[in-house]
């Protein structure tokens, strides 16, 4: 007969017709020296016959920065919160791919010890999805996330409209229209003379009315939103 010792869990052997066959699927990782020991009335081989089975581990990847940092929404030209990942197990490294492209101002940096970081200040707006792929000899999992960069608000006078009309008291002003762009939720207008008001609908501010007082009235349009407003407004 013959026996085999030192095999990893999940690996076994058979002995038939003078042949030892070692086979199976290891369920643990590590280095496993094994020894084949014939059973019989005479001496066994010295040194023993055997070999070594090396089982590599699957790679793992985990977010090590705060929960939620892997999916961020930031205003353009604003520093993002660092996004950190750790590759462990049998992983040897990581690469990153962006769709549709890496946002300008954002970098992917190895920190040592299989730690990796996404950081920087995006200078373009849009939605940017990323996939981090681990490297290694066995199963290579991935991690995904996204960075949504919202643009600053913009205010543009509608072509053909006069931003600085001159009218007589108690006479209607020509409508003044402004288009809002970028990121905004509302808008206000301050400084208008009595009798003149504004509406905001569909991203358009319309100033209209009949002034009932005379004078010079500088007015300011102020978009409301999460990002920067135009300076000067």
State what each model feature region is.
Residues 30-42, 85, 126-137, 215-227:
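A short beta-strand micro-motif common to beta-rich folds, especially ectodomain repeats
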Residues 58-69, 152-161:
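Proline-enriched interdomain boundary motifs that mark the N-terminal boundary
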Residues 71-79, 164-172:
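Short, solvent-exposed loop/linker segments at the N-terminal edge
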Residues 1-2, 88-95, 180-188:
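Extracellular acidic loop/turn motifs
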Residues 78-87, 172-180:
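A short beta-strand segment in extracellular, disulfide-stabilized domains
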Residues 21-29, 117-125, 205-214:
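Extracellular/luminal low-complexity segments enriched in Ser/Thr/Pro
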Residues 44-59, 139-151, 229-233:
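C-terminal edge beta-strand
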Residues 3-19, 95-116, 188-205:
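Low-complexity "stalk/linker" and mucin-like segments enriched in Ser/Thr/Pro/Ala/Gly
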């Amino acid at each position: 007969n013959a026996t085999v010792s030192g095999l990893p869990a999940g690996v076994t052997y058979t002995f038939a017709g003078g042949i030892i066959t070692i086979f199976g699927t290891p369920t643990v990782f590590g280095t496993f020296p094994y020894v084949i020991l014939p059973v019989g009335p005479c001496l066994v081989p010295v040194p023993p016959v055997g070999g070594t089975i090396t089982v590599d581990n699957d790679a793992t990847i985990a977010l090590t920065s705060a929960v939620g940092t892997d999916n961020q929404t930031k205003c353009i030209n604003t520093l993002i919160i660092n996004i950190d990942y750790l590759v462990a197990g049998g992983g040897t490294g990581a690469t990153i791919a962006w769709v549709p492209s890496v946002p300008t101002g954002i970098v992917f940096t190895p920190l040592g010890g299989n730690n990796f970081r996404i950081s920087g200040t995006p200078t373009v707006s849009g939605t940017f999805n990323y996939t981090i792929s681990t490297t290694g000899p066995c199963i290579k999992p991935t991690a995904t996330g996204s960075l949504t960069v919202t643009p600053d608000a913009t205010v543009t006078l509608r072509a053909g409209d006069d931003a600085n009309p001159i009218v007589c008291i108690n006479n209607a002003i020509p409508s003044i229209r402004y288009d809002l762009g970028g990121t905004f939720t509302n808008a206000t207008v301050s400084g208008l003379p009595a009798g003149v008001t504004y509406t905001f609908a569909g991203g358009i501010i319309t100033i209209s009315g009949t002034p009932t007082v005379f004078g010079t009235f500088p007015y300011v349009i102020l978009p409301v939103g999460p990002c920067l407003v135009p300076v000067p407004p």
